[in-house]
Amino acid sequence: MHYCNKDIGSFGETIAVDYIKNCGYIILERNFRCKLGEIDIIAKDKNFIVFIEVKTRYSYIYGSPSEAITFRKQNKIYKTAQLYIIKKAIHNKFYFRFDVIEVILNTLNSNYSVKLIKNAFQI
């Protein structure tokens, strides 16, 4: 990913964090990294720990942003989530879910749209 795409991704993650906070989520981690991979946002939603992948695009021209999350990427997120659960010793305390947030930016102005897909995938 080149520099401009990193900026777009980071901007999308900031929008996503604001959005889910307004939905009542509590942010636990941003950009959790380990040797297995990275999870954009880890949050608490009631009795769930939610592992969230954020995809930011300027349009749907190449399909929806969530379509870019391949099975391989899902598996990587799942394994990273497993490590987080073990590290935090929370396996018996919460339910777990994988959400996706799509952020579509507008090139003409500062408007954007956000779509939260709860339980977007299961491994």
Curated annotation (Swiss-Prot):
Gene Ontology MF term list: nucleic acid binding
Superkingdom of this protein's organism: Bacteria
Entry coiled-coil feature ranges: none
A matching Pfam family: UPF0102
Cited InterPro entries: Restrct_endonuc-II-like, tRNA_endonuc-like_dom_sf, UPF0102_YraN-like
Family classification: Belongs to the UPF0102 family.
The protein's name in its UniProt record: UPF0102 protein CBO2440/CLC_2288
Organism: Clostridium botulinum (strain Hall / ATCC 3502 / NCTC 13319 / Type A)
